[in-house]
Swiss-Prot record:
E.C. numbers: 3.2.1.196
GO BP, one annotated term: glycogen catabolic process
Source organism per UniProt: Shigella flexneri serotype 5b (strain 8401)
InterPro entries: GlgX_C, GlgX_Isoamylase_N_E_set, Glyco_hydro_13_cat_dom, Glyco_hydro_13_N, Glyco_hydro_b, Glycogen_debranch_bac, Glycogen_debranch_GlgX, Glycoside_hydrolase_SF
PANTHER family xref list: GLYCOGEN DEBRANCHING ENZYME
Keywords noted in UniProt: Carbohydrate metabolism, Glycogen metabolism, Glycosidase, Hydrolase
Protein's name according to its UniProt entry: Glycogen debranching enzyme
Length: 657
């Protein structure tokens, strides 16, 4: 091969122009950067990057072609106390690589050293980057752009969603292709889903600790190459990108948006005892928040924290997000531990990354959802994100569970959460849709487990049941575990129905965990991040068709209620909502705070949710008018006109007049 030309400092990464490849890499503290390319026999050829524009190192390799494997060796000081951990004996992944060849195994050679550098060369076993060329025909693809007020989110794992689906061809189950299969798309449409939110699909690695226990990181919240698709979800790693885009194109044609769960808060390099894959060896001091002693600020619980206030790291994160939108046509992002995005190190609404997103004509137009906390001091930031963001509403999750399963929440607190938690989100011009309401999510109990287990059962995770939250607000209804008498099963079913109704008929944006609509259980494991098995894979052969139909009917009912889809805050006397007691009268102040758990919620003057969350059957006097129960609480043609509803214990019903 010929020597490198100077090349250009932008864009970041490796880019083929038809004649060769331009390579760029950011490092503010490097003294020298070597591009290492590998031929078909694995022979390494090294080239110094000749260009240095500010903190960007760059070079152009004529005649290089797509498929070329490469990596970097970055030279600089080994000064751990200062936060510098350069080690040119270690081959490093390009942070902007579009494809990775090789596996991130637990191997001592993939560690740089803790206090002293490890100068053993690791090129023979280190994963390599691959130069790719992008030619994809999107045809007439267009984003659905579903209004927030009409959005129904379905949180799912690429593999777990389809791996056991009997109607999807065996050879594509658990893959990107399966997401776009007609069987899957028809199911989502019939259920009423408008947005498929996928757990991380950017390439991730399993922590060495898990590998030593024979486990793996199933969820994917351990990123190593943020521009590359995780190859294990592809039928062929070489075609992963096109398989993913084919699925997105098919989902878009069905009117379904795709939202990616993305991890910009930490990397798979973990703490100082963790592996050296990329950022630590490229510019540790710039990419991470570093303490005065040279160690990491661990505001994520994962060993390190990305410094998203550093200009170069902001550019990196912004470029990553734009890549997924522009190259893959995704419709939005859910940001894991998103408080890190606003750290300066204090949390600020005008933090550099927030400002960059707001000013970007691409990113400011997609759906943005924050998990609004991290584990740093003042890490809980629910309600404090910039107006462009919606946020996971854990207030709603806990309130719904406490009201229906612990019976210890006053009516006033329940109503506040039902009304999109306006005390939290009604500020800075935000709309009710800013509250992403959920009862369950990938972390925590499934909905079925909420009514079957009082305690977590995480022994399979190998941490002696210490991991996972103890604050589950669950209720096993008298027996720990699945199964039981008919009476027990029916009481659990009623609780599931109550929780689903609360979720899907509340103001705000509902998010449904995949599998909750057909009774999926993780057998009490509330932190199944490392379980690549039947605990996480949805067993469609055991799905409860009745529960699925109930859920679908609720979603379709929601779409008929103007007070829920118009995405306007409810105001006194606007006709959107009236709160009534069991006698169809406005609740008194005392009833709101101390009254029995009986409530009628009149929406849009036509739809009535009658609630009896007490231990006894109770007569509920409905407001004036001819009321009849509607699906999923009655048949399609229900001639019964009801004046008084005999509300069963812990029951609810929806009527229309």
């Amino acid at each position: 091969m010929t020597q490198l030309a100077i090349g250009k400092p932008a864009p970041l990464g490796a880019h083929y122009d038809g004649q060769g490849v331009n390579f760029t890499l950011f490092s503010a503290h490097a003294e020298r950067v070597e591009l290492c390319v590998f031929d078909a026999n694995g022979q390494e050829h090294r080239y110094d990057l000749p260009g240095n524009s500010g903190d960007i190192w760059h070079g152009y390799l004529p005649d290089a072609r797509p498929g070329l494997r490469y990596g970097y060796r970055v030279h600089g000081p080994w000064q751990p106390a200062e936060g510098h951990r350069f080690n040119p004996a270690k081959l490093l992944i390009d942070p902007c690589a579009r494809q990775i060849d090789g596996e991130f195994k637990d191997n001592p050679l993939l560690h740089a050293g803790h206090n002293e550098p490890d100068y053993r060369d690791n090129a023979a076993i280190a994963p390599k980057c691959v130069v790719v060329v992008d030619h994809y025909d999107w045809e007439d693809d267009a984003p659905p752009r579903t209004p927030w007020g009409s959005t129904i989110i379905y949180e799912a794992h690429v593999k777990g969603l389809t791996y056991l689906h009997p109607e999807i061809p065996v050879e594509i189950r658990g893959t990107y292709k399966a997401l776009g299969h007609p069987v899957m798309i028809n199911y989502l449409k019939q259920l009423g889903i408008t947005a498929l939110e996928l757990l991380p699909v950017a390439q991730f690695a399993s922590e060495p600790r898990l590998q030593r226990m024979g486990l793996s990181n199933y969820w994917g919240y351990n990123p190593v190459a943020m521009f590359a698709l995780h190859p294990a979800y592809a039928c062929s790693p070489e075609t992963a990108l096109d398989e993913f885009r084919d699925a997105i194109k098919a989902l878009h044609k069905a009117g379904i948006e795709v939202i990616l769960d993305i991890v910009l808060n930490h990397s798979a390099e973990l703490d100082l005892d963790g592996p050296l894959f990329s950022l630590r060896g490229i510019d540790n001091r710039s990419y991470y928040w570093i303490r005065e002693d040279g160690d990491y600020h661990n505001w994520t619980g994962c060993g390190n924290t990305l410094n998203l206030s550093h200009p170069a790291v902001v550019d990196y994160a912004s470029a990553c997000l734009r890549y997924w939108v522009e190259t893959c046509h995704v419709d939005g992002f859910r940001f894991d531990l998103a408080a890190v995005m606003g750290r300066t190190p204090e949390f600020r609404q005008d933090a550099p990354l927030f400002t960059a997103i707001q000013n970007c004509p691409v990113l400011s137009q997609v759906k943005l959802i924050a998990e609004p906390w991290d584990i740093a001091p003042s890490g809980y930031q629910v309600g404090n994100f910039p107006p462009l963001f919606a946020e996971w509403n854990d207030h709603f999750r806990d309130a719904a569970r406490r009201f229906w399963l612990h019976y210890d929440l006053p009516l006033g607190a329940f109503a506040g959460r039902f009304a999109a938690s306006s005390d939290v989100f009604k500020r800075n011009g935000r709309l009710p849709s800013a509250a992403i309401n959920l009862v369950t999510a990938h972390d925590g109990f499934t909905l079925r487990d909420c009514v079957c287990f009082n305690h977590k059962h995480n022994e399979a995770n190998g941490e002696e049941n210490r991991d996972g939250t103890n604050n589950n607000y669950s209720n096993n209804h008298g027996k720990e575990g699945l199964g039981g008498t008919l009476d027990l099963v029916e009481r659990r079913r009623d609780s599931i129905h109550a929780l689903l109704t609360t979720l899907l008929l509340s103001q705000g944006t509902p998010m449904l965990l995949a599998g909750d609509e057909h009774g999926h259980s993780q057998h009490g494991n509330n932190n199944a991040y490392c379980q690549d098995n039947q605990l996480n894979w949805l067993d469609w052969s055991q799905a409860s068709s009745g529960l699925t139909a109930f859920t679908a009917a609720l979603i379709h009912l929601r779409k008929r209620i103007p007070a829920l889809v118009e995405n306007r805050w409810w105001e006194e006397g606007d006709g959107n909502v009236r709160w009534l007691n069991r006698y169809a009268q406005p609740l008194s102040t005392d009833e709101w705070q101390n009254g029995p758990k009986q409530l009628q919620i009149l929406l849009s003057d036509r739809f009535l949710i009658a609630i009896n969350a007490t231990l006894e059957v109770t007569e509920i006097v409905l407001p004036a008018g001819e009321w009849h129960a509607i699906p999923p609480f009655a048949g399609e043609d229900n001639p019964v006109i009801t004046v008084v509803w005999q509300g069963p214990a812990h029951g609810l019903c929806v009527f229309q007049r």
